[in-house]
Amino acid sequence: SGAVRTAARLLELATEDAMALGERTDQEERDALLTSLGVAPGGAVPSALRSQVKSLEEDQKRRKTRNLRDALDRILVDVMSILRDVLMVQVNTGLTFINVTHGPAIEERAAATTPEMTLAALDATREARERIAHNSPPLLVLEALLISLSPAVKGRV
């Protein structure tokens, strides 16, 4: 379905964003550690020092996971800001959109849904953020969210 493909694409974008933040830094940190331990660039790491290198690699892996969760959270915050704009249109606040470049899509969504549906979508997005923060599988969280946001799910969101 379109929601599943979109979820996969969003995860791909978030992963690219997260990896871009860390790859160069990871190599620089590893090189700095090896230099401080007296290991020549490209040289073999003595067994007595491997635990320090392993510890650094584990820290880097945790940071990558955190970067991915942060990137996904940024996407979900963007979704929430769009839904906020939809709700503003639905309740006729007269306030300016936050996401002015998406005005036509916001107007279309506002006309096609009710304020109750938009509030449910905001709640589903908040729940997705919580699930990501609690280490749920990101692809499953995004798929569930996007399926729940799809217009085909009548009466829910």
Predicted features along the sequence, with ranges:
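AAA+ P-loop NTPase domains with strong preference for DNA replication initiators
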Residues: 1-113, 126-134, 138-144, 148-155
